[in-house]
Structures are given as C-alpha cells and as structure tokens.
C-alpha cells in the first residue's frame, strides 16, 4: 500500500490520481501542526472573550443572526452534522469517498479552519483503516459548499450513520470499533469546518478529468489506426501546418500523431502514389479538434488542481491577526465551469471517433468491404456496432449541456446563487463511459480494417495496439455475438491499454 506524506496545499495531480485508484496510508507533515494549533487557539480566544463570530457561536445560513450560548456550542456542531446529512441516491464507491476524504484533510490542515489536530488525525485514521463513510451521490448544489455529502462523511467521525469496512456496510459505530477507532466529539466551529467546502464537487470533476485523459490518449491511438485502415494521408500532421496556426494543443496533438504513425509504414507505401487530394475532416482535422480538446483538459487540470489544494471553508480563521472573516470560498463555480468545459471535450472526443467509425462503414470512403466484413448480406459486420456508437455520441450531446448556468436559490434566499458543480462533475462519469464505448468500437473496427489490408502492416506502435486487441478479440471472418467484444475492448481501454502508448501530454 502506498504511503504518502501530506504537505497541506501541495498535492500533485499524480498523487490525486493515485489516491483515487488505490488505498493509501496518509501521514501529515509536521510543518502543518503549528498553523492548525494557532487557528484553534484563535477560535478559543473568541469564545473566551464572548465575541460573536459566524459559525463559532451563531446559527447558520439565514439563522446566522442567532447567538448561541457557550454551553450549547458542542451540541450546535453535532446538530449541524446530523441535520445536514440529507443526501439521497446510490452510495459513492470507496475510491470516490477516499478522494473526498483526502481533499477534506488537505484543506483543513492548511490552518485556516479552526479545527483541532485530533479531529484531522481522526479523519486520517479513517483513510488509513479503510473505513469509508456512506455518502449518497446526490444532494449538493455546490454552495454553501458540498454540505450534504460532507455531512454524511462527518457522521462516521461521530459514530453515526453507516460506513463500509472491508467491503461490508456496517453501522458507523461498529465499523469504527472493528477498525480500532473511537468516535470524536466536535468543539466550536468544527462541524461547520467539516461541512463547508468544495471537496465532493472537486473529487467528482477530478474523476472526470482522470477518465478524460485516458479517453483522449485512446482516441488519438484509434484515430491513427483508422487513418491507416482507410489509407489516409500523413500530410495533415506536418508540423509546419500547425506551427502556422500557433494553437499549442493542436501542435502537440499533431506531434502525437507523428509519433504514432512514424514517417511511413507498409500500408502507407501501398498508396503512396494514389490520386486522393484530401481526406475527410474526421481524419484530416484530428489535430485541430483533438487539440482543442487537449486545451480544455489542460485548463481543467489547472482549475481542479488549484481547488484540490484550496481552503474552501467559511468563515476563515486568520490566526496571525486574530480575525475570523466570512466570505464565499465554498462557492464551487470554478469547478462547475471547469466540469462544463471538460464535458465539451469528452463529447467531442467521442463524436469525432464515431465519425471515423462511420467512415469505415462506407466502402466508397474506406476502400474496404462494406461494414468491414466479407460476404456482406449474409454477414452484417460492424453495421449495428456503428449504430451503438452513434447512440452513445447522441446521448453525450444532451449530457454536455452546461450545469454552471443553472441556479436555484436555497436557504430562504440567503444562498441565492449556487454552482450546481456536483451535478456538473458527476455527469462526466456517464459521458466518459459513453465515449469509452465509442472508442472501443473504433478500435475493433480499425483493427479489422487493417487486417483486411492483405497482410500489410502499420507502424510499430500501432501494430502493438492491434496486437493488444487481437490477444483478446479475434478477427471477424463472419458474424458472431458482438457485444462481448465491445465489452472486452472497453475493459482494456479502462485499464490503460492504449494510453500507455502515448507520451505524456498534460
């Protein structure tokens, strides 16, 4: 199991990916402790001096004007967690819960939240023991933070609700006991610090980004395979074309195609003197379209990496000045907009792949047998596989609708503009699954097309991509049950079978 020392505010994208993919043993860097303790001392001073400060000794939301007596402060924090745990929907999987928990720890340990080290260490202990709170997928609008999901996370700290331990759903109290842990009692401000933040929204969008990176790389490989299968030209990938435009994403994608295709191949030599002048856009404009998608991926990475390391609590404790200041860092608009932009890229990656599949079906465009199978009529070949790809591409067009332009006021109009970032991030998962299905069909089709080129071969890397598929899925000599082949190719893509052929592009 990977051991990671967490220096608050310094998580890298590769660390976040590892946290999502694998269980982790966390330890907090000692450099964070003084800042954490100073923020707690500031909160304690405010309570001792009888000063009024939002979230410490007041109600919440529209009830912020209500002053809470000192003897009720501990109960206030517990009540806050219980009342806000109002999510619905299927539970998030362990990987997503783990990522949310680490993001929460990373934010709290920055020392602006007034939460004790012992509570942060209790969260770390949950991660290290593999105790995963039951967090329903729905119920947050992404402002004031992800209240419901983070409340469900916090329930387990209190010994309330349910949690998963070693694959079994248990009452949280039981899960804690089996893991050798104890519930905690929250002090002033700690419940609010746990609940306020964009960690669920950010984790949802990060998963979308991680999947989009795999899809992008896989689509570039399959696009290169299709270029070979239909006797496409390498000329559109000439570096001079892309330098003339100056779009960095486009320049970098053209470089990836040159890397995959190399200068020539047996297939390329077979049509070196053909009379075609230009290829269809789905081949010729791959650097332009995929370059625009790459730009979106890179911009999304910058926004989400900043948010993953951000303090999105409210109010914030500035211990050096002895002040607690209310603001709006919990508003997840940056995450929502980033997720919306990422949705466009995921949709377009799939849409372009589907067009290349359609091109291969047309014997006039591909110079291959109709639907990529011999003895057509008796055999239907890839006819309906392309229809499936079209259905998935169409679904993604609807799912790509922006969520950040939507808002519904909540909390009696105190919270009158919200981000809808959780929904913006969560729909990326379905979009990614759809696009992966499309790319799987293209991989199957392109390899079939190259097979039909009478023993001619492509470049070494593309032959490796074909061999990887052929080790699991046989060439189509006649019709057979098609769905298992799509399922197999999809699983290989999800495992990074094609992504590893592409140099780092982020």
Curated annotation (Swiss-Prot):
Q: What is its EC number?
A: 4.3.1.3
Lyase listed as a keyword: yes
**Record field: transmembrane:** none
Which family does the record assign? Belongs to the PAL/histidase family.
> What the entry says about post-translational processing?
Contains an active site 4-methylidene-imidazol-5-one (MIO), which is formed autocatalytically by cyclization and dehydration of residues Ala-Ser-Gly.
Pfam name, any one: Lyase_aromatic
Question: Per the record, what is one GO cellular component?
Answer: cytoplasm
Protein name per its UniProtKB record: Histidine ammonia-lyase
| Modified residues annotated as 2,3-didehydroalanine (Ser) in this record | 144
Q: What Gene Ontology terms describe what this protein does at the molecular function level?
A: histidine ammonia-lyase activity
**InterPro entries on file:** Aromatic_Lyase, Fumarase/histidase_N, HutH, L-Aspartase-like, Phe/His_NH3-lyase_AS
Give the originating organism.
Salmonella typhimurium (strain LT2 / SGSC1412 / ATCC 700720)
Query: Where does the UniProt annotation place the signal sequence?
Result: none
Q: In which pathway does it act?
A: Amino-acid degradation; L-histidine degradation into L-glutamate; N-formimidoyl-L-glutamate from L-histidine: step 1/3
Enzyme superclass (EC): lyase
Q: Where in the cell is it found?
A: Cytoplasm
Any one Gene Ontology BP term: L-histidine catabolic process
Q: Which PROSITE patterns did the record assign?
A: PAL_HISTIDASE
Annotated crosslink 5-imidazolinone (Ala-Gly) location: 143-145
What's the catalysed reaction? L-histidine = trans-urocanate + NH4(+)
The record's keywords, sorted A to Z, are:
Cytoplasm, Histidine metabolism, Lyase
